[in-house]
């Protein structure tokens, strides 16, 4: 078999089994840290179907599966996977990785060495991950979360504890409501990050 043919077969398989979704019928809680204008555009137009996105999705799901097996066999998790749906609108959804035996939310994040070192140095979760678990806790009724960071390059682990902040949870819900209102009106909401197309 020619090397080029072999490489094409591998990539074709990854594309077919990556689990990458170009478009969803809901707004993911994991993206509520993003600019409302970007969330609106993603909901309306979807995400580009690139080989990079397929590769990253496949790798992410593969590492997550391995990590969940470790956590279950280590006696850390009592359950794996759960869909959280906002009571006020089922278009706000999230999928958690699991719950500890104590009932805390668990979120697994695989990151590069650079980001892993940044987390170790600060002792804190990355901003978008922090907001993500705050959203899960707000809509899912959790009081505590454990973010398990896994370095993709050397498989180091680091756990960051995050406590629920009701005030922030309310802000996240208000933002989610604004995004849905914009979707219903078919009008892009104001940019809050100064990087999206809406700000130009």
Segments predicted by a language model, with ranges:
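Metal-dependent nuclease catalytic cores that hydrolyze phosphodiester bonds in DNA/RNA
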Residues: 1-105, 111-123, 127
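Metal-dependent nuclease catalytic regions and adjoining charged, substrate-binding loops involved
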Residues: 2-4, 123-124, 135, 139-200
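Beta-strand residues in well-ordered beta-sheet regions across diverse protein folds
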Residues: 108-109, 148
